[in-house]
Amino acid sequence: MSDINATRLPLILLAALGIPSDDADSTLTRGER
């Protein structure tokens, strides 16, 4: 289970950081446009 958690943690972190980042980028792009 440790291996599974170790593999999921980075994916979850990347997903958590990536999703808000995409939304922020879209918002900034729309604001600039």
Curated annotation (Swiss-Prot):
One of its GO terms (molecular function) is toxin activity. Processed by the macrocyclase-peptidase enzyme POPB to yield a toxic cyclic decapeptide. POPB first removes 10 residues from the N-terminus. Conformational trapping of the remaining peptide forces the enzyme to release this intermediate rather than proceed to macrocyclization. The enzyme rebinds the remaining peptide in a different conformation and catalyzes macrocyclization of the N-terminal 10 residues. The keyword Ribonucleoprotein does not apply. Keywords: Toxin. There is a cross-link at residues 11-20 (Cyclopeptide (Leu-Pro)). Residues 1-10, 21-33 form a propeptide. It comes from the Eukaryota. Probable toxin that belongs to the MSDIN-like toxin family responsible for a large number of food poisoning cases and deaths. This is MSDIN-like toxin proprotein 6. NCBIfam families: amanitin. The lineage of its organism: Eukaryota, Fungi, Dikarya, Basidiomycota, Agaricomycotina. Belongs to the MSDIN fungal toxin family.
